[in-house]
Amino acid sequence: MESIELKVRPGAEPAGAVDELSGRVPELKAQWAALLEQAAAERSELLELPPYELSAKPSKNFQVIGMLFKTIQAHQRQNEYPKSVALCCLTEDDATMYRQVYNFYIPNTKAERMNSGLWD
């Protein structure tokens, strides 16, 4: 079973700022794919990815985080490992943005949405 989860870690070191990374999405996609492939080769149950400092511009967050979700989902469809990918977020508001991006791009049905219990 494929799984993507969010973990709020306020003290975690960001892997970068979305404002600076939005112009490097193909490079980021390759880096994420390499991390997923390494986790698959090691048969890791869990791959935990560091947080990103989100942008004040939602469009940039959708561009970067959307590609992150798409990359993870494509890998999980083709590979058994990692069984779960945990995306760290710096704040609850960041986790909400991640959920919004996920729900925009990934689920085909309402039941597949990532929900914190705050929405319908």
What are these regions, as identified by a protein language model?
Residues 1-120:
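Macrodomain-like recognition of ADP-ribose-binding/processing modules
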